[in-house]
Regions:
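N-terminal positively charged helical leader segments and presequences
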Residues: 1-73, 123
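Short amphipathic alpha-helix with an adjacent loop that forms part of the alpha/beta core around
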Residues: 153-159, 176-183
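Structured adenosyl-cofactor binding patch, chiefly the S-adenosyl-L-methionine
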Residues: 200-226
Length: 226
């Protein structure tokens, strides 16, 4: 049995309505996946749960899916942010894809003293996040923030949201202990540094903030995207 393709759409989803395919979605379904009129597709929009639909109209560059019935109700997902230093194209694409698959709700790229790239194509990252959500089965697509300097992000940090700093110096408690002590507070964030690590002044600045908790991931030095 052929597995059903999942597509993210922005339309409201309810039984009986028809959803217009974008040109890109049409190309993917018809020319890449070889779907035909009458084939079933799964749709989600991050608000109304997951729905089963059927290809009702297929034209040269457009098409429509009629919504049949709901497969899953929308449920509250973990609200975990990932604050990470900007990376080059390949690594930042990898981070976006894997963080989306793991359920991160928002990705916040930041510019640090040792950041080796300050340019990013946000539209490309949003597409990667959307495709990862479609593939992995989650019901939402994570948000992606405009890159800002680390200090800007932290100076406007939302009240009540904790930040777990992955400290490559090994000064913090093991991350397993930190997360156990916090009983995983929904509404936290994790902060990852750049290649070469945070500068000493950046570490000192962050550790003096009341909402920051340092955590160690062990003695091994990992790649920034890992």
């Amino acid at each position: 049995m052929t597995s059903l393709i999942r597509l993210y759409v922005t339309d409201k989803l309810t039984s009986g309505i028809e959803v217009e395919l974008t040109e890109k979605q049409h190309h993917y379904l018809v020319h890449v996946m070889r779907r035909e009129l009458g084939d079933e597709i799964v749709l989600f929009n991050g608000r109304d749960g997951e729905w089963r639909g059927k290809l009702k109209i297929l034209l040269k560059k457009s098409g429509r899916i009629i919504i049949l019935d709901q497969l899953r109700e929308q449920k509250l997902e973990a609200d975990l942010w990932l604050v990470f230093a900007m990376l080059k194209r390949g690594p930042i694409d990898f981070v976006t894809e894997k963080a989306s698959e793991l359920g991160v709700s928002k990705l916040c790229p930041v510019i640090t003293g040792r950041t080796n790239s300050t340019k990013v194509n946000l539209d490309r990252l949003k597409t990667i996040a959307m495709e990862a959500a479609e593939q992995c089965g989650r019901l939402t697509v994570p948000g992606i923030c405009e890159p800002q300097r680390l200090e800007q992000v932290l100076s406007n940090w939302p009240e009540g949201r904790g930040l777990v700093l992955l400290d490559e110096s090994g000064a913090g408690k093991p991350i397993a202990e930190v997360m156990a002590d916090r009983s995983y507070r929904n509404g936290d964030a994790i902060c990852i540094g750049p290649e070469g690590g945070f500068e000493s002044t950046e570490l000192e600045y962050m550790k003096n903030l009341s909402f920051v908790t340092s955590a160690s991931i062990g003695r091994r030095l990992l790649r920034a995207e890992t």
